[in-house]
Amino acid sequence: MKRVKLIDVLKRRNLSSIPLEIAQYTSSVKSDIPLMESVIEINKAHIVMLTKQGIININDASQILKALDEIHLDINLDPRLEDVHMHVEAYVIGKLGEEVGGKLHVAKSRNDQVATAIRMTLRIQLLGVIQALIELRKVLLTRCEEYLKTVMPGYTHLQHGQPTTVAHHFLAYQGALERDTDRLMETFSRVNLSPMGACAFATTSFNVDRKLVAELLGFNGLIENSIDAVSARDFVVEALAGFALIMTNLSRIGEELILWSTSEFSVVTLPDEYVSTSSIMPQKRNPGVAELLRAKTAHVYSDLIAALTILKALPLSYNFDLQEITPHLWNAYEVTLTSITMATGLLKGLKFDAQRWLQLASEDFSTATEIADMLVREHGIPFRTAYAIVKKLIHKMSSKKKKITDITPEILSAAIMEATGKRVQIDKATLLKALNPIESISAKHVTGGPAPIEILRMKNERVKKIGVDEQWCQTRLLSLKEAKSRLHRLIKKIERGERV
């Protein structure tokens, strides 16, 4: 196909006359590349609307639509044309001449067009991230069932707190990622609104149909105020904040996997493909992917802060500053999506050492709270008194290098006598039950607790929620597909010379 020679349609001069260093400084063509498909679709929908409204004739519309179809095959991005929008118009004019091609831009501006293109591109990205989150949540729920009764010490301040299970811990991850999913779904509803028809910021005196263009592009409605439509980028910040929260949660998962894979913990083996070795120390299994989950979080944070800083104190409506936000959006999206994929593989392939977890949970004093609770339940001792008794006893046991399992009924009775002056007979079986981390966990069948029966209930509820979320995604994708099909049917009618 013969390449169309592009000219600067705004300044009416050859591109060679524009100083390259200035063009490169002001151009957004590199960051516009992800917008190309959306920009072409916008122009097609705009031409269909102009034709329906009688603003341009069917013959001109047909030629323009055919030229738009060829762009992705033939266009060569040049920074001297500023952005992708001018490339599209310059191509159409170069192909058809200004008499016909010059009608492409009637009743629209780059301002409403770029705002629309960003929203169209972002909504697909949001759906992609949501689907990736769903896959990660599925892996967590599958592994919950596998590690339903795998006891581990629960932590606060990285110190042993109370016994729990790996399944309980994984459900906590799942809960955070479920909220991340919900947030992006809510963001989608605010992203999927059309600015088209706002033009530069004051709309147009042409009789355009904003709602038709919105429908043809798959939007759920309009950003009605035309100034707001072209200048708003809060939806970008909202998406970036959602990505940042996802990365925060992934970084926490990554950090725990790093700790757990150390020789000191030695409770998890990470998949071979997700670790690296040393160039000098042959024994090393460095958790490289998990470490990068932590580090790459900083990139997404910086993208969010950059967008907020660019927007700070910007006067309405459009300013060139806004074009500096989109590269941060694309970067944050790529980092977030790939990080979710990496975390999914890590969690799917890792293996826990159940015996080592149980050993850690049994040897330390993680069942101390259960002993205090037992004194309250069985002997009517006020909790704060029971707490003080157990605390003092554990301090004494620790100083003698004793374990919690070394506590006998006689030792506990003596501790109660010392604290209260009362003689209390401790049943051995009841004490052993309180000392046993497995028994401690089984007793905690309160809503949200670690007891296996409660874990299974929560897991099954979350499987249902995943089904709802998958259906939500499919509904949105189908809606976008149907809008695109409708647009293409109308284009075919125009190309056949029929009224729309």
Q: What does each model-identified segment do?
A:
Residues 2-42, 281-500:
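Glycine-rich cofactor/substrate-binding loops
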Residues 2-203, 208-212, 274-277, 288, ...:
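A helix-coil-helix interface module used to build multimeric assemblies
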Residues 46-56, 121, 165-168, 235-245, ...:
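Short, well-ordered beta-strand elements within core beta-sheets of diverse protein domains
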Residues 48, 52, 73-76, 93, ...:
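Charged/polar positions within long, soluble alpha-helices
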Residues 63-64, 227, 389, 410:
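Residue-level "edge-of-site" marker
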Residues 66-74, 233-234, 392-397:
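A short structural micro-motif
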Residues 118-119, 126, 130, 145, ...:
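Charged, flexible cofactor/metal-binding loops and thiol motifs
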